[in-house]
Amino acid sequence: MKKPEYVAAVTAMYRKYVDLYLKKGKSGYAVKPEDRENLMDLYNRGDSDTGYYKQHNGREMLALDRPNHAGVAAARCLSQNGREVTAQALTDLHAHDVLEIGSGKDNYTLGKKITKGEKLRFLVPKGMRFKEGFVFRRIRNEELIESLDQKYRKE
């Protein structure tokens, strides 16, 4: 079962693009990058999956390497000095977003908003090493979850 915010966002996005296609036709139809990223923030098994666009069923559609949420590319490692990692934001990040560092208990929760292109610094557990260029993934977009909760919450 999917979480309510996932169902609400996917259904709303589907409706939006069905309406757009019916209104403008194939030539006027294009998915906005921010809409795609929002969907991937909610649940993403990997950036390369095309879903049912190009095929129906088959082993290629299974996420064998990573069956859980893969998140979105969020920050690229610039350097590491001891436990402190310096990274550059690849997308806008929000307070309380969660970056995957290692296993679940080692994830990093941001304390403030970071704009795309800005540098951020955070501590990683002792013994963890990250090479320059390593991409940390956001596995929880708190601002998106909160906005969906506000929009669809039953009073």
What is each model feature region?
Residues 1-155:
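Surface-exposed amphipathic alpha-helical tracts and adjacent flexible/coil segments at the periphery
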